[in-house]
Amino acid sequence: MFTSTGPFTAAHPVILASGSPRRRAFFEQMGIPFEVILPVDAEPSPIEGEQPEVYVRRAAEAKARAVAADHKGRLVVAADTVVALDDMILGKPASADDALSMLRRLAGRTHVVASGCCVVLPEGGRETFHSITRVTMWDCPEEALAAYVATGEPSDKAGAYGIQGIGAFLVRSIEGSWTNVVGLPVAELTALLLRRGAIHCQLPVEAVHA
């Protein structure tokens, strides 16, 4: 009998240092018990010329350290995701006009989505990694971009689109992890948590005693 709907569980709830509903959904789907504790003013700004993968690692580490400092002996997971075109980081749009401007720049081009993830272990160790996905968009007409912006979906998305939602119609192809584009490199994170014994597989009783 499963005690959750996902394939994994943990002895103690993981602290997810993120308010992202997409990241919460991944944890729920995997069955990993967690609680959300948000870092306060911990996200740094990009440094001019900083590579996307360097920035997301630095940002994820800052978030994880901020939460772990007040929760010693707990496992903390933090992540940060950015979209970058020609090595220029595109954050969340400041307005509808800003969202449309970003989408115009991305249309017909290949850009990079970089996610950094930092795991602070209960004993105090820390592991940080990043994942890179290349996303190619088709040359979508202006009126379709404007119609997409009008849905409101781009407002809280890095790069002004959500591949898991309405914005899927903008994407011609991807090279790399799909979950990374959504906001969390799930395969890499699961492998790390299993390797460190932070989570374990939730097997039916008959499988355990077979």
From Swiss-Prot:
This is dTTP/UTP pyrophosphatase. It catalyses: dTTP + H2O = dTMP + diphosphate + H(+); UTP + H2O = UMP + diphosphate + H(+). GO terms for molecular function: dTTP diphosphatase activity; UTP diphosphatase activity. InterPro entries: ITPase-like_fam, Maf-like. The record marks R22, T81, Q164 as: Important for substrate specificity. The active site is at D80. GO terms for cellular component: cytoplasm. Its cofactor is a divalent metal cation. Gene3D superfamilies: 3.90.950.10. It is found in: Cytoplasm. Belongs to the Maf family. YhdE subfamily. GO terms for biological process: nucleotide metabolic process. Keywords: Cytoplasm, Hydrolase, Nucleotide metabolism. It comes from the Bacteria. Pfam families: Maf. Its EC number is 3.6.1.9. Nucleoside triphosphate pyrophosphatase that hydrolyzes dTTP and UTP. May have a dual role in cell division arrest and in preventing the incorporation of modified nucleotides into cellular nucleic acids.
